[in-house]
Amino acid sequence: MKLVKYFLQKKSVTILLLVLVLGGGLFSYVKMGKLEDAPFTIKQALVMTPYPGASPSEVQSQVTDVLEESIQSLGELYYLKTENRAGLSKITVYVKKEIRADEMQQLWDKLRRKVNDVQSKLPAGAGPSVVNDDFGDVLGVFYGLTGEGYSYRELENQAKLIKNELLRVKDVAKIEIYGVQSPTIDVILNPSVMARSGITTADISRAFDAQNRVVDAGGIDAGVNRIRIESTGNFYSLDDIRNMTIVSRTGEHFRLADIAEVQESYQTPPSNKMRINGQPAVGIAISTIPTGNVVDMAEAVKLVIDRFTETMSEGFELQTIYDQGYESAVANQGFILNLIISVVTVVAILLFFIGFKNGILIGSGLVFSIFATLIVMLSQGIALQRMSLAAIIIAMGMLVDNAIVVSDSALVNMQRGMRKRVAILRACSSTSLPLLAATVIAILTFLPIYYSPHITGELLSSLVVVIGVSLMFSWVFALTQTPFFIQEFVRRPRPDELKAALFAGKYYDKFRSALRWVIRHRYATIGCMVVMLVLSAWSFKFIPKVFVPALDKQYFTLDMWLPEGTRIEETDKMVMDMAAYIRGQEETEMVSTYVGRTPPRYYLSNVSFGPQSNYAQILVKCKTSKLSRQLHARLQDSISLKYPEPLIKVNKFELSPLTEAVIEARFLGPDPAVLDSLVGQAVEVMRRNPKVADARNEWGNMSMIIRPVYDPMKAGALGITKASMMESVKSINDGLPVGVYRDNEKKVPVLLKSGNVDITDANSLGDFSIWNGERSAPLSQVTERVETTWEFPQVRTYNRQLSMAAMCGVKPGHTMAEVHGEIRKEIENIRLPEGYTFFWDAQYKDQGEAMQAIAKYFPLAFLALVVILVCLFGNFRDPVIILCVLPLSLIGIAVGMLLTGFDFGFFPIAGWLGLLGMIIKNVIVLIDEINVQHRTGIDLYTSIVEATVSRTRPVLMAATTTILGMVPLLFDVAFGGMAATIIFGLTFATGLTLFVTPALYSMFYKVKGK
């Protein structure tokens, strides 16, 4: 107690330290980062490898498998998933969840080396591979640029000017431009003119190669100087290309413009497209440096953009699509308001229970604990965000609990006639160790979450740290600031004010009577509790299970897939029509569409799809979050009825990454046909369940392909190679690259395209003329046949095994756990041939991994808890009593979940762990008080009764402050379930502390009731 004495005697030091805490807390609040949600690390990387002309199966066997063999030697590898489409290998590398965030960059460097080591083993024409390890970066400030009457090229140029301005803004890390259409120079050949002139495509290719090649012209010596000679002839304008000379086989010279049309165009088919409210657009997505403040960065960006828009040409318009800075500021303001309401509520309750002066005394300790916690948060780089602010609110009741116990004990000692300082020191000495043990145990209950390597553990890590730090500060201030304030501001009762009986009155008498009855009927009481526990466990089957709750935002998204093989232009038409329909709803403020692939990751938990020509995403911004909920619910029910052809998913924003489907039954094996059969059976099971939505095969529908089967004999006689045949075919639509046009710093490909052709099927393709440089022949004369066939548009693997999944969603009003439970047995009973395996993927796998990650550290937390309790009490019976109380907390939780209708998931589980800490804290102090009174010579029965009576006021105060302090969180979509868990659980736990604990104590110590 020397520390307590020091702070009581050294007033100046105490006041200075408290002022420093207040000043440091205010400074920290101003300086610390502000975020919308807690950051977490996406422990994935993408390896993309082009292989033009290869089928999905060829990509998988010749490219992907080679890369996977090298990558799998990474010791940190968890598993690999691949998606192989025509001409493109896409490998997603998942690393072990135990890998720390600060080790990720070194790991990605190792991955790059593994990928680079096998580039020489890839087939000719494949590669190079690109390792994308920053696709998890958040570009949270997202603008869209539109320009009525402007081309995509002009939009791109304007976006680049804006990008150059924004890169100079403080805390801007990188800027990505989305929706840019790659420019081309199309040389559209006229077959009839070429036939008359004798010009072939080979002649044109040779001319481009000769003129566009960069040649070193050397230099000349001029006295003491060496003067470099610059080669010319490069293309710098369209006229340079049009005026290029083409020499025919007969030696005649022609201008290219005489035999072909030269025009500016864009890549066909485009890789992606973006629109805002139906207008063509390009996106400008901006990320913050890791140590930056996104709120400040977003405000600085807005100032630059506001200034820049004043100088833009008329017609250009910049619109905010998503502003993480604004969203963070709004979220912080909402939570700060909730925090203020909680603090005011707690202080008001204290004033009601113990009067103005004592209430302010204890309430001030709460403020000091919060401000000291802010200092630590700043020093540890913990930003103000949803989790850290919620942690302070969750810890609110526990923060005042220590001060309540110390001050109540000191006040009781003074009522017993002790001098003020003696009463304070006696209170601190008798409660410091039990309160420290209880505080440490309350922190230990969160240990499994803190050490969980899963994303959910990382998501909640700041919540655990803030709760732990604030609880320790509450203990420190309870033994320093609280005694000091009692000494300075609380008057010692006069002799005539001393009470003969401290806990007298009709309410105390009624409580004593009830307590004595419980002790007399302890076995019946405990039996009733056990029955209630069994009933509550049974009632959990009626509580919806949703692992991570959705967020309440103005935004939601729609993901749309048309049948595989759909042209991107058709996808764009469909999504434009759908966006126009959504834009016509009264709740809508803005609609932006993204065709071909998802936009940059403007929100951390967003999922990436694409490149896929049949895919599109719609981002809907509503006028308010309430209207967003209304429109989201309505579209869930109606959008698929209005647009039956595509698969449509309507998604709310969530705290953790979404999976491609809610439920995935994944089959692994060597034969795609067998996998297709197994998945078909699983899909049929899903479709029979009325709660299932959009049951489908992960590989999609079979796509039509046209296959010209090259005939070496026939083609060889005509001198036509397979390469020249395929190059000619490519010129029909995509275009054959023959040169480069230099447009400032950009190199624009020059493409040869065949004009006046109308090819839509195998028959018309067979009539198309193929050139060999000397002559032409119809395609049908150089092939065995031109056939139409079908193929899977993609081939997927899991850990180097062919992998195919039956996927489905869940209809509104139902949950994954509910539907999975209904279809699980039948799908698991599907007979698997030898060599084939099955497992549940997606949300089921993710949730199982999260729970396993938490359960992994439960034994450690439990062992630490038991060791502390045994060391504190010096016996086994008291710890066993405490452990027997803990399961009974589920009774209150079950009642709360059923009454409020909240889903039970990861956050309520975290709330339950915190609740256990609160219960343990109360029971420790109660049992310690029983033991203290018994050691003074009071019989054990009386000690049980009187100790419980003496703890009634502090227990009720702590419980009431916690319960009412949590009320603001009840209305938060993310934390409502957690708040309900603590509120109802603690309400029931208060009864456990005051009635069940004495009953258990009397039973374990064989104390007879009177």
Regions found by a protein language model. Name each.
Residues 1-34, 431, 498-549:
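Signature of alpha-helical transmembrane segments and their immediate interfacial
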Residues 6, 37, 48, 90, ...:
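Extracytoplasmic/periplasmic membrane-proximal domains and adjacent transmembrane bundles
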Residues 12, 20-54, 116-123, 449-458, ...:
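Transmembrane helices with small-residue packing motifs
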Residues 16, 55-62, 99-110, 139-142, ...:
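Solvent-exposed, non-transmembrane alpha-helical starts
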Residues 25-31, 344-411, 469, 864-951, ...:
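Hydrophobic transmembrane alpha-helices and their membrane-interface caps
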Residues 58-132, 192-213, 234, 569-658, ...:
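Solvent-exposed, membrane-proximal periplasmic/extracellular interface segments of envelope transport
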Residues 321, 328, 332, 407, ...:
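Helix-loop junctions and hydrophobic alpha-helical segments within the transmembrane domains
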Residues 396-410, 431-451, 458-498, 618, ...:
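Transmembrane alpha-helices and their membrane-interface boundaries in multi-pass membrane transporters
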